From Swiss-Prot:
Keywords: Acyltransferase, Cytoplasm, Fatty acid metabolism, Lipid degradation, Lipid metabolism, Transferase. This is 3-ketoacyl-CoA thiolase. It catalyses: an acyl-CoA + acetyl-CoA = a 3-oxoacyl-CoA + CoA. Heterotetramer of two alpha chains (FadB) and two beta chains (FadA). The gene is fadA. It comes from the Bacteria. Disulfide bonds: none annotated. GO terms for biological process: fatty acid beta-oxidation; phenylacetate catabolic process. The keyword Lipid metabolism applies. It is found in: Cytoplasm. SUPFAM superfamilies: Thiolase-like. Pathway: Lipid metabolism; fatty acid beta-oxidation. CDD domains: thiolase (cd00751).
Amino acid sequence: MSLNPKDVVIVDAVRTPMGKSRNGQFRHVRAEKLSAQLIQALMARNPNWDIQLTEDVIWGCVNQTKEQGMNIARNISMLAGLPRTSAAQTVNRLCGSSMQALHSASQSIMTGNGDVFVIGGVEHMGHVAMDHGIDLNPEMSKVTAKASNMMGLTAEMLGKMHGITREQQDAFGVRSHKLAWEATQQGRWDNEIVPIEGHDQNGHKVLCEIDEVIRPGASIEDMQKLRPVFDPANGTVTAGTSSALSDGASAMLVMSAERAQALGLKPRAKIRSMAVAGCDAAIMGYGPVPATQKALARAGLTIDDIDYVELNEAFAAQSLPVAKDLKLLDKMEEKVNLNGGAIALGHPLGCSGARITGTLLNVMEWKDGQIGLATMCIGLGQGIATIIERV
């Protein structure tokens, strides 16, 4: 297909394997190092990339303190060996942070404010807990439900509103692990995972090449044994149907089509449209629905035009209502999360947006699809969506 000079193209996308946050393979590896090694991998994989042209490094990260503080994007940029003349910024749209990084870079390219960007995100939830240092304002209870900051309870609420059963959630959780492990065994992650040095259970250095969060033997019987964790008396959401805490990073090289052509780089996809949207904080998991509807309208598409979808699996009780209202529930096995999702891989908050977009691109190449949708929910009631098209 023909490209316009200012079309935003994705040249490459990579990620780390996902590590368990509790005594996992990256327990002795810092967030900056996970990220810097991805940028170095992008350099190695794309030797025609003139790094001197890099305008900005935009990195998503949610809890920006401790090793993730002091503008981690700039620290990553310098550790990776990018020129000092390239700028760097860290962005925070909670779970959608690294997808927002992609949007911010795309908007800059579209408006002529730079040609070459490195975007990505990271969260080391083993080193910096999700709630570390958080001081919530009690006055928030005047404007939204008191449980709006408790993600598991928002999933319970959304699931109840849409009649999602415990059995449906358990089946969805097993599906995620099954598909993710199949993808591992069949090498479908190989083009996106960059092996990273970590440590085994005995503390010995090892090269980490697979997602350690996946449970290959996950079964319905095992899921049924788990108790609800957020609403023990009446709930349906368990640890097995929630995204795991994990450590990981993701990265993309994006630029204008004219710059990619000038450098002799072959784009893999272009950005068709982008959108963010708000929803009630008490059902924050619903955000992908209005965000996707906006993105589809901006691209002049309908959901039937989308070949493949990556929907971040914060919770099964959240993902299923979104799939239902996007008219995807009957097409799950054909086009949604064909390599599993965050229930199996975990959800390192700042990492996930670029991760699912990169995974979407690889699924589209594997299945020879043309148009794909990546979308995710965001805490306190937001959604974000990106539509890409292969070129």
